[in-house]
């Protein structure tokens, strides 16, 4: 291009503009375009399989971890146990397990994945956005399990979120941190289903922010 026609603004934005065009051409290739329940069922099956492929966790084992009880706090209507369990030989998951008292087992149960923040202790102690909601579930007669996500809270060396490094590292290794978190939550569900107090036909999931995102993936 002759010097007189050189446009520095075009050069600066050229690759971003290319990416926008590329995205417009290739985005939402799995969107649902049907109009019947039957077509939706077919789409859901293929979309679910594609999501699992993109999460890249098929190399991870499927087994129910054993839990270790660290301590227990007793409230009037329920107990709160601090527990931990191994999902891999190198990975330990701290968690809180809430069990109502004086209720007929098996009980309805909720898995409560935390959101972005300071982890499980924030969820069970903070009066703000979380409203200590696992305590409220236990008061209402639900068993509740609050597991610590990879990169947060007690699983962070700095005590702050380290998800950016873990996200980028796993991407370079051909996997995803979202996939690892979902896989660990699946193991949490396995633990709940193994407990005699739990009604395995009435297990739900409830989370805020990242916890809400992980609830969608689990569903």
Q: Which stretches of residues belong to each language-model region?
A:
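Short, flexible loop/turn elements at secondary-structure junctions
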Residues: 85-89, 99-101, 115-117, 151, ...
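Cap/lid segment of the alpha/beta-hydrolase catalytic domain
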Residues: 105-194
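Glycine-rich nucleophile elbow surrounding the catalytic serine of serine-hydrolase chemistry
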Residues: 207-217
């Amino acid at each position: 291009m002759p010097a007189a026609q050189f446009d520095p603004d075009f050069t600066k934005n050229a690759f971003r503009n290319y990416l926008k065009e590329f995205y417009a051409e290739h985005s939402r290739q799995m969107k649902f375009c049907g109009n019947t329940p039957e077509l939706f069922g077919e789409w859901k099956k293929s979309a679910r399989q594609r999501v699992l492929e993109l999460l890249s966790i098929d190399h991870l084992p499927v087994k129910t971890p054993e839990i270790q009880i660290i301590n227990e706090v007793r409230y009037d209507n329920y107990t709160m146990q601090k527990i931990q369990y191994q999902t891999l030989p190198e990975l330990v998951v701290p968690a809180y397990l809430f069990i109502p008292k004086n209720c007929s087992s098996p009980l309805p149960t909720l898995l409560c994945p935390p959101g972005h923040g300071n982890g499980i202790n924030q969820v069970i102690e903070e009066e703000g956005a979380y409203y200590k909601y696992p305590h409220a579930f236990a008061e209402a007669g639900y068993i509740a399990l609050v597991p610590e996500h990879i990169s947060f809270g007690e699983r962070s060396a700095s005590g702050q979120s380290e998800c950016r490094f873990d996200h980028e590292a796993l991407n370079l290794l051909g996997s995803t941190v979202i996939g690892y978190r979902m896989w660990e939550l699946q193991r949490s569900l396995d633990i709940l289903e193994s407990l005699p107090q739990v009604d395995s036909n009435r297990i739900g999931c409830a989370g805020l922010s990242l916890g809400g995102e992980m609830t969608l993936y689990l569903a």
